[in-house]
């Protein structure tokens, strides 16, 4: 399968999506941040000096989705219909799992926006709590689901 982001001279190009059909596109991505108990408890108990960590991560994740095309060179700017973020508390492992669901009506998908949303949300948590735990790890950033477009639906294997 030839790479769509290279022209005949093997140089980078942005794919022309002008002839593609506008359809509803949805993408769901997820990722996790793990930390020590002190950092986890500080977040849960709202004791982080920088402010409300999880709420700030949600806002940052929304901004990440909106700014995706500015940071990923071949990503088309897309008008987003919505970005919805959920953060699950995982007390047993002192971690948080962040889910981002992005929706649009467009000629190209929103997978990159969902992945960027998760990444920026998790990085924001790291930034806000790094004074407590510099050894935090971000892992498992992945596309869980996508629908719409010519390639159809995708669901990650569980």
Curated annotation (Swiss-Prot):
Catalytic activity: (8S)-3',8-cyclo-7,8-dihydroguanosine 5'-triphosphate = cyclic pyranopterin phosphate + diphosphate
Pathway field: Cofactor biosynthesis; molybdopterin biosynthesis
Domain of life: Bacteria
The keyword Chloroplast appears for this protein: no
Active site: 127
Record keywords: Lyase, Molybdenum cofactor biosynthesis
Enzyme class: lyase
EC number: 4.6.1.17
A Pfam cross-reference name: MoaC
Transmembrane spans: none
Signal peptide, first to last residue: none
GO molecular function: cyclic pyranopterin monophosphate synthase activity
Methyltransferase as UniProt keyword: no
GO biological-process terms attached to the record: Mo-molybdopterin cofactor biosynthetic process
Ligand binding (substrate): 74-76, 112-113
Functional description taken from the UniProt entry: Catalyzes the conversion of (8S)-3',8-cyclo-7,8-dihydroguanosine 5'-triphosphate to cyclic pyranopterin monophosphate (cPMP).
Subunit structure: Homohexamer; trimer of dimers.
Family, per entry: Belongs to the MoaC family.
Protein name (database record): Cyclic pyranopterin monophosphate synthase
Organism: Helicobacter pylori (strain ATCC 700392 / 26695)
């Amino acid at each position: 399968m030839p790479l769509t982001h290279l022209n005949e001279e093997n140089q980078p190009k942005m794919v022309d999506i002008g002839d593609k059909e506008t359809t509803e596109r949805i993408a769901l991505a997820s990722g996790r941040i793990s930390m020590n108990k002190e950092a986890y408890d500080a977040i849960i108990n709202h004791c982080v000096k920088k402010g409300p960590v999880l709420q700030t991560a949600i806002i940052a994740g929304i901004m990440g989705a909106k700014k995706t095309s500015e940071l990923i060179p071949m990503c088309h700017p897309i008008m987003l219909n919505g970005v919805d973020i959920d953060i699950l508390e995982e007390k047993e492992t002192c971690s948080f799992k962040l889910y981002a669901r992005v929706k649009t009506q467009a000629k190209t998908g929103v997978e990159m926006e969902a992945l960027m949303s998760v990444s920026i949300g998790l990085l924001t948590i790291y930034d806000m709590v790094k004074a407590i735990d510099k050894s935090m790890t971000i892992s498992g950033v992945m596309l869980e689901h996508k629908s719409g477009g010519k390639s159809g639906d995708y669901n990650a294997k569980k």
